[in-house]
């Protein structure tokens, strides 16, 4: 077995699992009556208190799923950091990751007329 799989330090923690970790951290903070900025969204500046709580308690968190039985979150600190502090907006991050995988995007970006009108664009028949 490769050494990275043995020490459970591979980046197998998904974005959904990090978001679930976020939700559990918010619930724990609420349960302990530490409610400062717990309603802030992950991408807002006010979310720093929840992010600090997660960073401070990484060694206590575990994720249990079928793909990895002993995933302590502290081994995935790079993945957690990338998710909590994105360097770009999610649309551009997705475009970059899909382009890296497929070498060219498999979808078309919505034209500017769509963003102004807030209605889906349709192709003429």
UniProtKB/Swiss-Prot annotation:
Keywords: Transcription, Transcription regulation. The keyword Transcription regulation applies. GO terms for biological process: regulation of DNA-templated transcription; viral life cycle. Pfam families: Baculo_LEF-11 (PF06385). Involved in late/very late gene activation. Belongs to the baculoviridae LEF-11 family. This is Late expression factor 11. It comes from Orgyia pseudotsugata multicapsid polyhedrosis virus. The lineage of its organism: Viruses, Viruses incertae sedis, Naldaviricetes, Lefavirales, Baculoviridae.
